[in-house]
């Protein structure tokens, strides 16, 4: 079974903003392109990315960037009943935002490491994580 990873919005932004941790995320993308790893991108991370982009750039630029991200070697994961239930369980037991509960729950469902920069995920017990340098 190939190693699996879920990209949090912060991991995507690490690439787009050329932040610390860039090399680690680029390595994961390269490995996924070579079928060495499986990368998942939750629909909720795409939604977060879209609203953040819309605050900074035009709608046309936003759509272009989203198309670029969707072209990465990632599996964009849409909602399922099982995923919704897992997210609700996490949200009911932790202080995570709704979006972060969705994203964390996908990692648990796929037995994947969550690639992120968000210390809030520390509240989720047994969540496998590939932590990027936290923002200060």
Question: Over which residues does each language-model region extend?
Answer:
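Acidic, PIN/NYN-like endoribonuclease modules and their adjacent C-terminal/linker elements
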Residues: 2-4, 104-136
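Histidine- and aromatic-rich ligand-binding microenvironments
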Residues: 7-8, 41-42, 95-97, 118, ...
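A generic structural signal for short hydrophobic patches within well-formed alpha-helices
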Residues: 12-13, 46, 121-122
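Anion (oxyanion) recognition and catalysis
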Residues: 33, 70, 108
């Amino acid at each position: 079974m190939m190693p699996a990873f879920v990209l949090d919005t912060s991991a995507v932004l690490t690439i787009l903003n050329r932040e610390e941790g860039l090399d680690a995320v680029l390595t994961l993308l390269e490995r996924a392109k070579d079928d060495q790893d499986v990368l998942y991108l939750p629909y909720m991370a795409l939604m977060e990315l879209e609203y953040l982009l819309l605050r900074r750039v035009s709608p046309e630029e936003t759509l272009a960037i989203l198309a670029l991200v969707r072209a990465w070697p990632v599996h964009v994961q849409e909602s399922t009943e099982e995923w919704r239930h897992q997210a609700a369980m996490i949200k009911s037991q932790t202080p995570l935002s709704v979006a972060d509960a969705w994203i964390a729950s996908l990692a648990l469902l796929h037995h994947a490491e969550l690639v992120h920069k968000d210390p809030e995920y520390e509240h989720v017990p047994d969540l496998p994580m590939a932590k990027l340098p936290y923002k200060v």
